[in-house]
């Protein structure tokens, strides 16, 4: 579309394109709601539209290391902010995109035959994904759903109980990175996209093939080349099986009860 063409030609920055698309989605969602409420049909063509991630090789210092990830998650825990902790963890441990997190519904959460919680992602480009949630994260998610009394619909909402938007999650993350950078617990400010880059890098360094990671995260294989520099430098010197980033469910339980 025209946004991608402008980004590729250098006439528009990637971040500006993302913001413009977000605005268009919000406007069309309003029009759709208004039109349907007045008994007419409206096709929201922007509902499933998204911009591809920037196609470039990431430098070795582009992503947070294991200590920085721990500092971020610990800050959310210390603030008793279970929603922030869960949102950050879904990116870091499962590589979900910002948009996917905002679009999560309770109906997508299910159990497989072995009793593990899973996310049945809706089809995108005619491709479905069935993602097993790590046990520690599954415990936290289950606790969160019960504590928030979520019966159906959006898993994450704003203070007005409307579905959270991508700019809301970015602001939420920024509220933590601002403090952590000042406290020298982060090297720089990170975005939701940066956290996803870290998640994918962990998967690749843990031995998963580019095709396997691409399939799991819902992107095309060509995007995997952007992580070559990070993998070669091996700045995150741990296995990328996400069990290496352990989460303590007992502390979450304590926070919810408080």
What is the predicted role of each segment?
Residues 226-258:
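DNA/chromatin major-groove-contacting recognition/catalytic segments
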Residues 1-58:
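N-terminal core-binding DNA-recognition domain of tyrosine recombinases/integrases
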Residues 103-109, 214-221, 229-236:
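A short, basic/aromatic helix-end/turn motif that makes direct DNA contacts
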Residues 134-186:
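Active-site/catalytic core of tyrosine-dependent DNA strand-transfer enzymes
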Residues 68-98:
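Basic, Lys/Arg- and aromatic-enriched nucleic-acid-binding interface segment
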Residues 103-139:
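Conserved tyrosine-mediated DNA breakage-rejoining catalytic core shared by Y-recombinases
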Residues 53-70, 125-135, 150-152:
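DNA breakage-rejoining catalytic core of tyrosine-based enzymes
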Residues 174-215, 219-220:
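Short, basic (Lys/Arg/His-rich) helix/loop patches that form interaction surfaces
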């Amino acid at each position: 579309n025209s946004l991608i063409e402008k980004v590729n030609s250098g006439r528009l920055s990637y971040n500006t394109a993302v913001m413009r698309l977000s605005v268009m989605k919000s406007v069309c969602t309003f029009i759709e709601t208004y039109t349907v409420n007045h008994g007419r049909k409206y096709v929201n063509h922007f509902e499933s539209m998204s911009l591809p991630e920037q196609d470039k090789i990431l430098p070795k210092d582009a992503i947070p290391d294991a200590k920085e990830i721990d500092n971020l998650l610990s800050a959310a825990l210390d603030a008793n902010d279970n929603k922030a902790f869960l949102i950050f963890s879904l990116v870091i441990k499962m590589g979900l995109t910002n948009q996917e997190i905002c679009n999560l519904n309770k109906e997508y959460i299910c159990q497989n035959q072995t009793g593990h919680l899973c996310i049945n992602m809706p089809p995108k480009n005619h491709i479905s994904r069935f993602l097993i949630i790590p046990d520690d994260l599954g415990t936290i998610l289950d606790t969160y759903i019960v504590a928030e009394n979520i019966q159906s619909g959006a898993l994450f909402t704003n203070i007005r109980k409307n579905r959270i938007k991508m700019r809301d999650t970015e602001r939420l993350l920024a509220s933590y990175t601002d403090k952590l950078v000042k406290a020298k617990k982060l090297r720089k400010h990170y975005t939701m996209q940066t956290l996803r880059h870290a998640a994918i890098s962990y998967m690749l360094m843990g031995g998963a093939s580019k095709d396997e990671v691409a399939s799991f995260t819902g992107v095309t294989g060509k995007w995997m080349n952007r992580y070559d520099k990070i993998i070669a430098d091996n700045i995150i010197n741990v296995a990328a099986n996400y069990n290496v980033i352990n989460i303590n469910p007992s502390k979450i339980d304590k926070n919810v009860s408080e």
